[in-house]
Amino acid sequence: MKPQILSKMGQRTTEPPISWLMHAALSRPKLISLAAGFTDSASLPVAEARAALNQVLRSPKTGQPALQYGITAGDTTLRQLTARHLQKLDLQAASRLGVMKCWSDGAMNPTPHHSNTPILHPETYSSKRLLITSGSQQLLYLTAEALCNEGDIVLVEDPTYFVFLGILQSRGLRARAVRLERDGLDLAHLERVLQSLRRNGALRRVKLFYLVSYFQNPTGVTTGFQKKCGLLKLLKKFERAAGHPIYLFEDAAYRELCFQKDNQAQSSGSTPSPRPSGERAGARGLGLENHWSPHPAPLLGWRGEGEVKSALAVPGAVDRVIYAGTFSKPFATGVRVGYGILPEPLFTAVKHIKGNHDFGTSSLLQHLVARVLASGIYGRHVARLQKRYAHKARVMKLAIKKHFPPAVEWWEPEGGLYFWVRLPRNVPTGVKSKVFSTALKNDVLYVPGEICYADDPARRKPNHEMRISFGNASEADIREGIKRLGKVLRKLI
């Protein structure tokens, strides 16, 4: 028998789906990709980045630090600017909506707080526990490496970000899925999952809950602040049986990609959520049946920059929340600068592991991001991008309404880059399906929904959904791509 030279991890690690999706998009000139979540190339801030870099490199005093090694945790100035930026996002949400006091008398019960003074503690956003990473993606991997042993369990949304599922598989970790509702996580289902794991003696292997909290990839759902409170309360409730902390990892990669529209509806704190559309819109849940409210409340306007506070703003939760953000999607994906706020002992462990990986994120790119943050370039660019994506989403929505058959359901996002689409249950959309192969023959590509679901033995993996992106496609390509895909769907449904 030929000896196996690869480690167990090397054997488990397969090519990520994102790799062949990107390869297909880049290698076929006539193909219209509605798959990979590329950002809008036409909106990339070339002139702004050039001006900022010119300022960084204008003299030896400013340029030499940017071209030298830095510290593993990240440039001190950028960490301070990032901490203030994150605190500002939560303060804006708190000021608009009123703070929800979630840890009243240690009970973590969400109750409205109507004081004019937001209850947000500066130490929560301390730059001393903020780590700069090479994109927020790196923090996903580093956290799994620092926290989890082979065979441990990570709780995820159902569906979830498929690249993170690949990280779990590579490291030999198990995923257990928790259903989504139109306003975020299904807390009742989470409690049942935790109870089942406790009965089976597996709760001690649960280390983490992974939540894509804003305009979720792939569904577009936003989990509201009250649900974040309830989530943390449930995790804390089961910690005694687990015998260790159970952390919440809040992935906020899409937080600032909220849509800016004219004449925004005024609300009093409702959580934005995607609008179900189609002939039977709202009749079934995201992925699993009967979990979506059949009578969704009217969708209220999203007014920008994070109406929903992060889990960091939950009083008393600072030692249980890992928060990941990024400057890549809101500014320029090629910059690959992200950040995380972590509690101890995780912060130190992750920092040390990162040091073994790369000694620290690119100094030049960190100085670039610090310059655009401090100068206001970043904020102005994000505001333009929010309007741009709102327009492109509207173009895709109108094309879907025109070309998709009535049997297809879809959810209209209020931020992010994606539409989530569901076909009748007897029409699979996977890589080996007739829909996928016919779409490729017609030079249009989507992400099969099945790759966004964890391999959870507690339920059958849905295979009749798809994710389509308006991020990088031109308006003409969005219209033509949806037309091609609609032709395929009308033929096969």
Which residues fall in each region the model found?
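N-terminal small-domain helix-loop-helix segment of the aminotransferase-like
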Residues: 11-95, 121-134, 374-375, 380, ...
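Conserved glycine-rich beta-strand-loop-beta hairpin in the small C-terminal domain of fold type I
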Residues: 370, 386-397, 409-423, 432
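Short, conserved charged micro-motifs
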Residues: 427-434, 476-480
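Conserved core of the PLP fold type I
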Residues: 58-98, 120-245, 249, 255-265, ...
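Intrinsic disorder/low-complexity segments
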Residues: 92-124, 203, 264-306
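Conserved core segment of the aminotransferase class I/II
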Residues: 316-387, 394
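PLP-dependent enzyme catalytic core of the Aspartate aminotransferase-like
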Residues: 2, 92, 441, 457-493
